[in-house]
Design a protein with these regions (language model features):
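Short, solvent-exposed loop/turn elements at domain surfaces
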Residues: 31, 60, 120, 324, ...
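Feature activates predominantly on carbohydrate-active enzymes
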Residues: 35-38, 68-243, 262, 266, ...
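Acidic, contiguous N-terminal accessory segments
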Residues: 8-72, 77-80, 88-99
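Bacterial N-terminal signal peptides that target proteins for export
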Residues: 1-7
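Structural motif
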Residues: 24-30, 53-57, 75-77, 112-116, ...
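Short, internal active-site loops enriched in acidic
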Residues: 56-57, 227-230, 274-278
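Substrate-binding groove of N-acetylhexosamine-processing glycoside hydrolases
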Residues: 150, 202-203, 210, 214, ...
Length: 652
């Protein structure tokens, strides 16, 4: 076999020399140039490297590193392989004559890329991705940057409600094509803006995705049909043909997109995500098809799987809900037989404090990556969505607490069986140095369980915006949001008993003990780390502790209210429990001003600029606490009168 090799000479220096650096004499691809710059910035003068681009098929999407006579030789099957090597030098810098070999276990690793101070090349180096999802159509410059990094670029179409794409354009089209107007079901989050039975609707959708794909000449399009669904038409034609049902509407919409993109040679990735569990949002019912029960997922998507082009990719969240932390695993992933599937992770600050709180998801990522690998296989893919969730300016790669989540995803997406201890050690050493790293890693590992307890009591749900719910009814909807309500453990956790009140409180107390240990470990490590890093970590762990104190009172009071309701249905009440709710109210009133209390000039590693320049959008816990107290008072007074809450008696 003839191997075609192009040599990129970045210097012939001993790795131990203290002068010189990585210099560039001849480069044939910008990805190699970017990799050289990253190596220089990360390894400085202590490296000499020769890059070799090889066309060997067995090195198509990976790299290898060897070292002889003090010179590193990095071999890659494609130019992006050099970026992958530059993103994790801690894994190969001590290599000898026996090469360090890195091969990707998934054919595709998709990354969502938006506004960032870091370039596409830097993100590719950090995540090991080989495809990028842009916002909307992206720009020509962004697509060019992706191609310069030797990765594919995908446009993104959000939802299938034409009114949300552009109300004026939609109304004008419907005025010209009145038969395309749908019949709305009423009081539904999913709308019937256009009629899927009408040919003019199909033409509109084909034109939309065609324009999106060609605007910046992306390589393909990622589409998601929710949160804004506009094809839920209930007209006579749709009822007769069955196109008034979600499964049929999804299948026909995917078909339109395929018909538009195939002649252009563009690829299609369809996200199967919906909106958590079915629930009321204000006065509208969110159907969230596919999540109401264990067998509904395939019933919703099976028709689209079967009818789709074999080249269409289906991308499914590893979570069986649109929330974190620690939701149950997807019921749909691995069931699109004969189709390529991607597993998706959203490490976007949802329900973990919008990335302000320290919130590891490393253990969950490891468990789900290993499970997903068996379901999607080597020809499948993985996808990563990062961010602060409605908080602009968040830089996931710079966050000294939560960048470990991106780092772990990268390591696990290249080796699902990677040792989690090694991931933590390597990340903490990079960020904090060897002396402080071990203690900081031990501290931040505890945040995964602590944040889960603070936001998701007894494994039940929380709002995807991390906010405190404003009412009892909304909070109880959200308790079911992770879809455990139909599982035995979920039903048991929701039971209105004193035992469950005790379980909620005990879970919070254990988490508070974990945050105390986090604080102790960071204080012990502080003398060996940068003072600003120590200050930021101690502040953010303190925020988490205060959040736990408040959530202990809120969730304890809510479960007490549920107990009082159940007692009321039996014709009795327990005034002592109301007294406990009153004490919870005092705790929330006292501690709520301390939530996210900070020096306005403090700089945050994850968010650009001073913390005081940002609004931490978690809202106040007081409205929910007032509503709990008010409902509990009504229940007690029904049996014991206005003074009954104070006399400490149990009324029959």
């Amino acid at each position: 076999m003839i191997f075609h090799r192009i040599f990129f000479l970045f210097c012939v220096l001993s790795a131990g020399l203290a002068s010189g650096g990585v210099s560039l004499s001849d480069v044939a691809h910008p990805a190699a140039t970017a990799a050289a710059q990253l190596l220089q910035s990360r390894l400085g003068d202590a490296v000499g490297a020769r890059f070799v681009l090889s066309s060997r098929a067995d090195a198509a999407d990976g790299y290898s590193v060897s070292r002889a006579d003090g010179v590193y030789v990095i071999t890659a099957g494609r130019p992006r392989g050099f970026l992958y090597a530059a993103g994790e030098p801690e894994l190969w810098r001590d290599v000898g004559a026996t090469p360090f070999v890195r091969k990707a276990p998934f054919k595709t690793r998709l990354l969502m890329y938006g506004k960032s101070v870091h370039s596409v090349a830097e993100w590719i180096a950090a995540t090991g991705a080989n495809a990028v999802q842009l916002s909307g159509s992206g720009t020509s410059e962004q697509v060019a940057a992706c191609h310069a990094a030797d990765v594919e670029a995908y446009a993104f179409l959000y939802g299938c409600d034409p009114m949300k794409w552009g109300a004026s354009a939609c109304e004008a089209y419907l005025a010209a094509h009145p038969t395309a107007r749908g019949v709305d079901p009423g009081r539904s989050w999913e709308k019937g803006v256009m009629c899927p039975s009408d040919p003019a609707t199909a033409a509109f959708f084909r034109a939309k995705i065609r324009a999106l794909a060609t605007a910046a000449n992306a390589d393909g399009v990622v589409v998601t049909l929710w949160d804004t669904f506009g094809l839920y038409c209930q007209c006579t034609r749709c009822k007769k043909s069955g196109l008034n049902q979600f499964a049929a509407e999804i299948a026909v919409c995917v078909k339109w997109f395929e018909e538009a993109l195939k002649p252009l040679g563009k690829k299609l990735i369809v996200r199967t995500w919906s909106s958590g569990a079915p629930h009321f949002l204000r006065d509208e019912w969110v159907h969230a098809p596919g999540y109401a029960s264990a067998d509904e997922a395939i019933a919703t998507w099976g028709q689209a799987f079967a009818a789709s082009d074999p080249k269409t990719v289906f991308q499914t969240k590893v979570y069986n809900a649109d929330c974190q932390p620690n939701p149950p695993f997807s019921l749909l992933l691995g069931r699109a037989k004969g189709r390529t599937e991607f597993a998706e992770w959203q490490i976007a600050g949802q329900t973990v404090g919008l990335q302000w709180l320290p919130a590891s998801v490393v253990d969950h990522t490891a468990a789900t990556m290993r499970r997903a690998a068996k379901l999607v296989g080597a020809d499948g893919g993985v996808a990563l969505y990062t961010g602060g969730y409605n908080c602009s300016g968040y830089e996931a790669l710079d966050d000294i607490a939560n960048s470990v989540n991106v780092y772990a995803w990268r390591r696990l997406s290249w080796n699902p069986d990677e040792d989690v201890d090694a991931i933590w050690r390597d990340w903490a050493t990079k960020v904090y140095g060897a002396k402080a790293g071990a203690k900081v890693a031990a501290a931040l590992r505890l945040s995964e369980r602590a944040t889960a307890a603070s936001f998701s009591p007894l494994g039940l749900g929380a709002p995807t915006e991390s906010r405190f719910a404003g009412s009892v009814s909304r909070r109880e909807d959200l308790l079911r949001y992770t879809n455990r309500q139909y599982l035995p453990e979920g039903k048991a956790a929701l039971a209105p008993t004193r035992e469950n009140v005790a379980r909620v409180v005990a879970e919070k107390d254990a988490a508070l003990a974990q945050t105390d240990e986090m604080l102790r470990l960071v204080k012990d490590a502080a003398p060996q780390m940068d003072a600003a890093q120590a200050q930021e970590l101690l502040l953010r762990i303190g925020w988490l502790r205060t959040h736990l104190v408040v959530s202990r009172a809120l969730d304890g009071a809510l479960w007490r209210l549920r107990y009082l309701r159940a007692e009321g249905q039996l014709g009795r009440t327990d005034e002592k429990v109301f007294g406990e709710i009153e004490r919870d109210f005092e705790t929330v009133r006292r501690e709520s001003p301390n939530l996210f209390k900070h020096d306005a000039d403090l700089k945050s590693s994850g968010y650009c600029g001073a913390v005081g320049d940002r609004e931490i959008l978690l809202r106040s816990p007081l409205p929910l606490m007032r509503d709990i107290e008010s409902e509990a008072r009504k229940v007690v007074e029904r049996f014991a009168g206005p003074a009954g809450a104070k006399n400490g008696k149990i009324s029959p």
